[in-house]
Structure formats: C-alpha cells, structure tokens
Amino acid sequence: MLKIGSHVSMSGKKMLLAASEEAASYGANTFMIYTGAPQNTKRKSIEELNIEAGRQHMQAHGIEEIVVHAPYIINIGNTTNLDTFSLGVDFLRAEIERTEAIGAKQLVLHPGAHVGAGVEAGLRQIIRGLNEVLTREQNVQIALETMAGKGSECGRTFEELAYIIDGVAYNDKLSVCFDTCHTHDAGYDIVNDFDGVLEEFDRIIGLGRLKVLHINDSKNPRGSRKDRHENIGFGHIGFAALNYIVHHPQLEDIPKILETPYVGEDKNNKKPPYKHEIAMLRAQSFDDQLLEKINAGAE
C-alpha cells in the first residue's frame, strides 16, 4: 500500500489532533510534523500536545505511521561555537522524548553544517553529538537527511552519511531520510538513473536504513547545490521521475512525505497543494494545469 502524506502543522490547542485532521483532509495516510516552529526551540510540554485525541483521530482515518522533523536550528556539526553544539545536543535529547511520546519512530535531522571548519571536522563533530544523544534504550531512530550541499552542509553524499553512521556507537538508532530535491541538487541523477542511485545507496549505506522519503521537485538543475523545492512535476526532476520513485517496489513500505511549496501569488493567501499532489501521484497522471486550478480555488 502506498504510504503518502505531507508536512502538516501541529499548532493551537488541538496540536496532534489538528495535524491529523489536516492530513486526513488531504487524503493522506501518513504525515510529518515539527513539534513546534522549525526556526526556534520554543516547545509545549508533552502534556499539551493532545496526543491521545490525535492518535484516536489517526486510527479512525487509517493513519498508522507519522514522522517528526527536528528544527533547522539544531547544528551538532558546529565546532566553532560550542554553545550552539550543546544547545543542539540538549534539544535533540528532548525532541527524542517528544517523538517517543507522540508514537513516531522516525525523527528526521539535517545532520549539521561545519560553518567553515571543513567537512571532516563537521562530520566528526556530528558523530560526537550523536554519541552524546543516542541511548541503547530509545525506540526512536534519528533519520539523517540527504542534503543538497548548500553552504557548509554536511551529508551531501552517501559516503558522508555512511561515515557518520560508522562512527556512532548505537548506530542501530540511525536511519536515513532520502530527499529527492536534495539528492538531485547534490548531483545524483535520480531523473535518468534512479535505480543506479538506489544501488549506490544500498552499496554504501544499505537499503535497510532507508526509512523516510521526502518527495519534492527542484527549482534548480542537477548538481546546483541550492535546495529549493518545487511543486510535483513543475521542476527539473519532473513528474515521471518522481512518480517512478513514489511507486518503486523496493520503497513500498516507506512513508513518502511532500514538502512542496504553497501555491499563489498573494503571500498572505497561499494554498496548500498537498491534496492535489497526493491525488495526482495516486492516479499516476500529471496535470500540467494543476497550479492554475489550485490558484482558482479548486477543491
């Protein structure tokens, strides 16, 4: 069965219930949340996340598996500012607790940025941070995300992710989130040779570690190292390649999460594309008028 959904918002008093309601309105059977704003560390207590009501709604709507994404501000690759590193370690520990409480198994993490110290120093610092965070007892896996290589990001290549995994003591608590836009922008040819890319991933990291897919088109050509998401079928990856990935038999059991941009010229009135993109991928048929239809208020 195809597991497909999108990033949804967990906010207000409803929190997890609101997230599940939004996902169900898109026809999704999985979804991804941030436990608070991705740009800061302000978080509600576990008791305020409305977990029980959210889980009941999920069960009633056939949503079994959800994913949590750690905030962007965590940087355990920072060797120059140890306060930033320590904040990342402490916050990641708390985020694992929240993820466990919600009942999610995967916590997606941007590995980190070396901020000028060099890739090797950044990778070693990420290993150090993960070794401080991970415990034998935890059930949650941290899913290291494949990165585009923008700025000083670490994790652009499969080899870099494998290096991190190999250096971590409890690396059974590590998995990988494969982002289509990021891997494309990092230089992997997922358009013409996705099977070859998947074989390379399996050889270097192992397909058994692949636990989350972020399905995004890209505004930029392959190898641009930009990381700018585009709506499904309207970018440089294209619908055919993304549809092939979404329905790939080796990836059937992996949740596929859309993080494509909201649609509209008016910044204050942009519309989510997810209901339409999910339907399009389920039908395996591209609608080149989709963005106009969403703009026009298509239900």
Swiss-Prot record:
Reactions that this protein is recorded to catalyse: Endonucleolytic cleavage to 5'-phosphooligonucleotide end-products
EC id: 3.1.21.2
Keywords of this entry: DNA damage, DNA repair, Endonuclease, Hydrolase, Metal-binding, Nuclease, Zinc
A biological process from GO: base-excision repair
Lineage: Bacteria, Bacillati, Bacillota, Bacilli, Bacillales
Protein role: Endonuclease IV plays a role in DNA repair. It cleaves phosphodiester bonds at apurinic or apyrimidinic (AP) sites, generating a 3'-hydroxyl group and a 5'-terminal sugar phosphate.
Enzyme category, top tier: hydrolase
Cofactor binding, per record: Binds 3 Zn(2+) ions.
Cofactor: Zn(2+)
Record SMART domains: AP2Ec
SUPFAM superfamilies listed in its UniProt record: Xylose isomerase-like
Family: Belongs to the AP endonuclease 2 family.
Entry binding sites for Zn(2+) 2: 145, 179, 214, 259
Binding residue positions for Zn(2+) 1: 69, 110, 145
Binding site for Zn(2+) 3: 182, 227, 229
Name recorded for this polypeptide: Probable endonuclease 4
Pfam families in UniProt: AP_endonuc_2
Species the sequence originates in: Geobacillus kaustophilus (strain HTA426)
GO molecular function per UniProt: deoxyribonuclease IV (phage-T4-induced) activity; DNA binding; DNA-(apurinic or apyrimidinic site) endonuclease activity; phosphoric diester hydrolase activity; zinc ion binding
